[in-house]
Amino acid sequence: MSIAESTVLGEEPEWFRTAVFYEVLVRSFRDPNAGGTGDFRGLAEKLDYLQWLGVDCLWVPPFFSSPLRDGGYDVADYTGILPEIGTVEDFHAFLDGAHERGIRVIIDFVMNHTSDAHPWFQASRSDPDGPYGDFYVWSDTDELYQDARVIFVDTEPSNWTWDQTRGQYYWHRFFHHQPDLNFDNPKVQDAMLEAMAFWLDMGLDGFRLDAVPYLYERPGTNGENLPETHEMLKRVRRFVDDNYPDRVLLYEANQWPTDVVEYFGPEEREDGTVVGPESHMAFHFPVMPRIFMAVRRESRFPISEIMEQTPAIPEGCQWGIFLRNHDELTLEMVTDEDRDYMWGEYAKDPRMKANIGIRRRLAPLLDNDTNQIELFTALLLSLPGSPVLYYGDEIGMGDNIWLGDRDGVRTPMQRTPDRNVGFSAATPGKLHLPTIQDPVYGYQSVNVEAQLENPSSLLHWTRRMIHIRRQRDAFGLGTFEDLGGSNPAVLSYVRELPGDGGDDVILCVNNLSRFPQPVELDLRKYEGRVPVELIGGVPFPAVGELPYLLTLSGHGFYWFRLTDPDTTGRPVL
């Protein structure tokens, strides 16, 4: 199959603003050839399942050639694929299969650093005067850039590591085996764009750009969010927009919202509108830990406060929000006091901690409480931004805290109650990671096959909620208004989208307490409208002048559409 033959979806420039994303680890999703490692052929086999679930876009973490000392984020070749997970032709077939089902695909692209096994680094360390001599950041001293924090405090004592071959120190913001690229070198910039073009030419729908705040280093700064970094990222955006329209750039910048907004590159036009020439999307990291804090404290204020602190983003841009992913539940963007609280509540065993976070999946974090899992998912699907689900969370998969680093949340997808969870026909010892054997979360009780047969399962509930969300553009495009309310244990907000056929108004009411709670809401601006519950289509009493009273079960929630009654007094659905 040639690149020109690759299937590309139709033009829809802002598709990502209403999309539901799904992160899938290729090596853990499906092994079709009994090799013990999932591959692109296996992932292609399961595209019908992902289409059925309602996924709009797959996010695929790194699958490039790599020593795999950091789950593939240690890249050894930006245009090569790990042999055990397939070939370029296999990737083509997977990409076309996804597009044929209306599913887009973005992949991780690690700009900041490479593996120390990358040929660029090997050439740089062995030939300082050669063409790759200044592809990385080298120094005769380890005293430079002392204001830059060490990110992996558990394992790295410094951001500098001595290289015996070159006789100099090299700079790394992450693990010592991941040397940072030198973006002051124009050849490095060009090499990054060439590697991106390699994948975009195949019809890829975009990239999640990993660790973007750290591209440049400057004395007297913390080496994060520097002007030079923003200029480089704007160059990337221009390159993509000019050559590959309708593709998306999703930035990973684990920063405060006021800093992250700058990664959209907000610029004001003459007509007063604000556009973003840098990223299309950026993750809103601080929301995620505050959802966990709010529910455990039974108080809306952690969520309300961070939403109030979130600036408006440029037109045509979008947040990405998530509950869990392939990394630890990061606690960088909380206070020391809140971090200790989160560790005390959600990581009672020291093995559950990793760096500045918690390495657990969603279901174990919530003690496998179905009501809590559903509430968290409802918040994910209704708060501002495009939601990103993590593979296996739709069935309540567990984790394995006995595995090293973040591998405990990257175990094989549990499809059947058979040996190896329907992931592989290999002997168990050949699997790249062991399956979950836990009596609560083990594959005998938690698997896709069993939940498909049960209409009341978490899987069917998650699918139903995804499809409801996809029917209402207000969830992705609408404004957000926190309604407050009489009860601090209840978080209520309105998502509103103006339209030619009338405004689409969605009212979301969430009980963060484990006990039933009443709440009175000021809905006078919607007087006369009839709340229609979106899951069952049940109309509630019309909104009047008085505070609107609702009672919610423990960890319960409502999604309403506030409809205009027709001439018969019935709600307009």
Swiss-Prot record:
Transmembrane segments: none annotated. Disulfide bonds: none annotated. SMART domains: Aamy. Ca(2+) binds at N112, D180, Y214, L215, E217. The active site is at D210, E252. The keyword Isomerase applies. InterPro entries: Glyco_hydro_13_cat_dom, Glyco_hydro_b, Glycoside_hydrolase_SF, Malt_amylase-like_C, O16G_dom_2, TreS/a-amylase_N. One of its GO terms (molecular function) is maltose alpha-D-glucosyltransferase activity. Substrate binds at D70, H113, Q178, R208, H326, D327. GO terms for biological process: carbohydrate metabolic process. Keywords: Calcium, Isomerase, Metal-binding. Its EC number is 5.4.99.16. It catalyses: D-maltose = alpha,alpha-trehalose. The keyword S-adenosyl-L-methionine does not apply. Catalyzes the reversible interconversion of maltose and alpha,alpha-trehalose by transglucosylation. NCBIfam families: treS_nterm. Belongs to the glycosyl hydrolase 13 family. TreS subfamily. This is Trehalose synthase. The lineage of its organism: Bacteria, Bacillati, Actinomycetota, Actinomycetes, Propionibacteriales. The gene is treS.
